[in-house]
């Protein structure tokens, strides 16, 4: 039996995308996307925010860097990927990111809606 590795998030950017270029010249953008889950209780409503790290490659990376800013609404579809590295203090680190394969700029931001 096969497996499926599919992720989709629709949320708002916590910061403008960061763009860098690999040693081979490939553009890579990193995004931090917030999604909110509404929690209703008897006396109030709160929101639980989850932050998602996303990496975009090539033309998608350049598009994101050129057109997105903090607060913008965006949808990203892709696959989950684990990254491992050693930080500057020698600590082993690991995180899960979404490697974006589809990018939809939804226009507007939280700031514009407020």
Residue ranges and their predicted role:
Residues 1-114:
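Single-stranded nucleic acid-binding surfaces, predominantly the OB-fold ssDNA-binding core
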